[in-house]
Amino acid sequence: MNKGQNQVVPPMSQFGGQNPPQLSSIPPIVNPVVVQNRTSPGTPFITNKAKEIYNRRQQEEISSDSEEEESPIEPAKSKYSRDSRDSRDTRDSRKPKKDSRNMLGSLQKTGTEIAYEPAVKFEMILPKVVKPTRPETPLGIYEQYTPILPPVNNNRFNPAAFQHLFAPSSALLYGQSVKMPMQNVYNINLPGPTGGHVAMDKIYENILPGKNVKCGFSTLGERIQMLDYIRQILVSSCDGENISIDSSGGNSLLSYIKLMELNPNFYSTITNNPYKGLPYGLLIYRSCFPIRFEPTNQSVVCAKNSIGLNIRLYALSYAEYYSYKLNNNIYLEYDVWRELMYYEYVKNRIIKSKQSPNFPILYAYFFCPNRNINFFQLKTNCLTRKELLSEEYKKFRQIHEAISNTGTNKIIRPMSMSGQNDKCQLPDEVDPLFRLYSGTTLILITEAPHHNLYQWASRTYETDGIVQRMTSSGFYDEKIWYDILFQIISALYVMQIHGIYIRNMTIEDNVYIKDLKISGKSCGYWKWIIDGIPYYVPNYGYLVMIDSNFKDTRSESSLLDRDCCEREYKIYANNIYSQKYDSNVLNENIFENYRRIINTNAFTKEHTKNNVMRPPESIMRLIELMSNDPEKNLGTVLHKYFRKYLNNRIGTLLRRDTEIPNVRDVTRQFNNGEMAVEVIGDQMYKWCMVSKTNSDGTVEIITRSDSNLDDYIIKDVRIETLKQYSPYENIDQNLDQEVKLDDNPLETYTISSN
C-alpha cells in the first residue's frame, strides 16, 4: 500500500480485555453526521470555518492550562516580600541538596547579608583545552569506486556488502574502510486515475510567484497572474498538447501536481458515494499545486502555500476525437467540446474583461492517449437494477460487446461528412460504433472551489477513533448569507446578458464556494457597477463560483428548432457556438434556473436532516420574496432587493462645513447611479441616488426616510428640486466597523445589459 495515502483505521472499542461486557440488544439512536477523514498537511482546501474552530479549540486549551497554573486558594504575592521569600526558602529546602559546602555557606550568612547580595556576579571561566585526537588508520585503504551492480528486485543499493574485501578482520576493529557512493533511485508512488498507483521518477518542486498577500485570490488580477504562471509551467507551446497521467509518457502531469479526492464536491441526501454523482465519461479530481517530496515516507505532499486545482478527465469517443482533430465544424455538436468552448468564452469575455469574478478560470487543456481508464466499468458500477433493465442500457451493452468482438487489429476510421444525405446525421448517429471510447482523454485544468453551497452550510466532523470532532459548524450570520445571495444572482445576471444557459442548474450541482484568505472579519470590499448603479459588497472571505459539472440530463423538450440533428445539449449559448437560438427562450430557461436556485424548497427537511444549516429567518423571508417575484430581469431583481449595498450616505444630510460648500446647480443631465443632492429646506440638503431619467423630465431617485434604517424609497421628483455635487470632491461614506468603505476597493466589476 502506498505510504502517502490515507489509511482507514477501524474504530477502537471502548471496552478492553479478553471478556468485554455484553452490549444491550436495544439499538442505539444515532444521529446522521457528515464525517470526513483527517485532511493531509499542506492541503489548500482547509476551509475558513475549520481554521476558526481549530483556533477556538487551541484557545480553550491554553485558557484551561493557565487556570491550572494559578493557585485558587492563596492570593498572589510579590516575589520580593518577606512571605514570598520565606515560602520560596521553604520550597527550596525541600529540594535535594546538591552541594553541602554551598549549603553550609548559605546557612552561615545573616539575613542582612542575604538581603544585600549582589544582583550580578562576574566570574571568569577558563575554556577547557581539548587535545586533538590522532585519527585511527585502518589496515587497508582502498580507492573509491562506482559500483556497477544494479539494485536487485528494486531494492536500494547496499554499500556494506562491498566493504573489507582485502582484510576482512579489519571490520571488527575499524568498521568501514571505504566511503561508498550512494546511488539510490527512488520510485515515488502517486495515486492516479489509471487504477492502482503510478510509479514516478521525477518530481518538480515549484514555488508560487509574488509575496504572501493578505487577501490572496480576492481579485481577478491575482487570479489572472496565477493563470499566466501555471501556463508557463505546464504548457510548452499551446493548448491541446499531449501529456500523460502515468509513468508511461515522457511528460507526466503527476510530476507537477498531486491528485487528491475524487469528485470532492459531490452532495447527495441519499448516498456519500462520489461515483454516483459522476456523469458517464467524466472523472473530476481535486489536486494541489505546487508539490513537495517528503523524504521520510517517500511520498508527495502539497506545498505549504499551494493552490487548489480541478483535474477534469473526459472520455472522447471516436466521433468526438476525429471531428475535432480533422477541424470539422460538427465537433460543436458534442457536449465535451461545447463545455471546452464555454470555459474559453468565460475566461476571455467575462473574467479578463472583469465583468464578474464568480466563474472558475480554465488554466489549460491537454490530450492524453490512455486506454487504462475503464469509463465503461465505472458507469456499470453506478447503475441501479432499474437502469440495468432499461432499453438504453441494453443498447449500450450491445455496442460495447460489438466493439469487444471486433478484435484489436481492426481500425475504426471516421466516416465522410460530405453532406450528401437528405437528413443531417452525425457519425455516431449513423454508426453506433463511433460512440465508443477512442482511447484518448481530454484533460481540463480549472480553478477548484472548496465545497458546494450545501457542503459549505453543513456541520462536518473529523473522525479520530471513537471521537467525532467538529471541523465546521455550517452556521453563518445574515450578513454573510446576504453577500452570498448577491454574488449568485449577479453571476446569473451575467449569464442572462451573454445568453448562456446550463441545463437544469441546481445548488448541489452548479453553485460552489471558494474560501479566501482574510484577516479579521472582512478584507475590504468589491465594487459592482450593474447597469450604472454602484454596489459596495464586503469581502467576508467567501467567493461564489458558478460551474458546470457535465451531469447527464434527460429532457423531453428541445431548444434546437431545426429539422435535422435533433440533439439535446448540456450548454446553450448564442455567442459561443455556431447555432442561433431564440433569445426569449434562452432568457426564460435562465430564469427557471434562477427560480430553481433561489427557492425556499432548497432548504427543506430533506437537507436539514443531512446536517445542512438553514439560513437565518430574515434570509429565508428574502428568498421567499424573490422566488415569488415575477420579474425576469435579474438586473432589476438586484436593484430591488440589494439596496443595502448602495452608498450608505443615501438619505443622510450633507455636512455643513465640508460638503454644503461643494453643492452646484444642475448644468447637465444626471447619469444612472450618480449621487445627487435633494433640496429639503433652506440650507438643508439630503443625499440621494439617481436611478433613471424619465421621458417627461422627472428624475427617479433612491432615498431613505430615516438614515438609520434600511427603508429605501424610490420616487419621482422634478429636476428643479435637485442639485449636483462637485465632481472634483469625494463623497466619504459613513464608517463601518467591519468594512472600510474608502475610495480603494479590492476590484471593480462592470455589468451592463447595453
Curated annotation (Swiss-Prot):
Statement: the UniProt record of this protein carries the keyword Glycosyltransferase: no
Subcellular localization, as worded in the UniProt entry: Virion
Record field: compositional bias (Basic and acidic residues): 49-60, 76-93
Organism ancestry: Viruses, Varidnaviria, Bamfordvirae, Nucleocytoviricota, Megaviricetes
Top-level taxon in the UniProt lineage: Viruses
Biased composition (Low complexity): 26-35
Region (Disordered): 1-110
Protein name: Uncharacterized protein R403
Biased segments, Acidic residues type: 62-72
Sequence ranges of Polar residues compositional bias: 15-25, 36-46
Gene Ontology cellular-component annotations: virion component
Keyword terms: Virion
